[in-house]
Amino acid sequence: MSYLLSKSRKDHPDKNGEVQKITPKTANWEYVGFEMYHLQEEQELTFDTENTETCFVLVAGKATIVTSQATFEHIGNRASPFERIPPYSVYVPHQQKVQIKAESYLELAVCRAPSQGSLPIRLIKPEDVGVEKRGYGNNKRLVHNILPETETADALLIVEVFTDEGNTSSFPSHKHDDKNSQTETYLEETYYHRFSPSQGFALQRVYTDDRSLDECMAVYDGDVVQVPKGYHPVATIAGYDNYY
């Protein structure tokens, strides 16, 4: 199995509901962290943002989120990401405690990046999320810009992408690994994959020009692909829609 592929633990979650956890240390990179939790109704978790800015994305389900500055009650608007409507998210700066109570079955993504900033805690509502259709032919996808580079954050960039069966995305192939480029934005990326129907899969390749990195992975529901550098296209299979 590729070292870039983190298999889902959704069938055997930790007692706190954790099914994925990517840190800079485990990924052997500098910045990005990603966690996924599957919480049962009434289950509660407390998070410490520590030295990171953190965005909590309600991938599916409803919750109340309590922070030091605000309480966001009864947020969440979709039972599945495949409803294809923008989600609710909450942005929290570093050195904050956050309490989350699930009000239904909850799929919660926790996205982190190092930060010493003090940007305000804020609710990102569905109407705040930019929606765009990209591509043509068999290269079409729907994008939800939850926290794009045009919005206020120190380092985080968060999007959802929906790719229909038999299409490619993150294509034409492109990369984000040159810190000194005038044309590239340096990014480390985590792709959290979901499929409809859930037994589906996709193929994702991560490779560099010189092929010193060249990994092609069969990715299943709940898996995470880590992209430290290089090109990273995704190809869906007929009959299975993809979300990441």
Regions found by a protein language model. Give the residues of each.
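A short glycine-rich, His/Asp/Glu-containing loop-to-beta-strand
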Residues: D14-T46, N139-T190
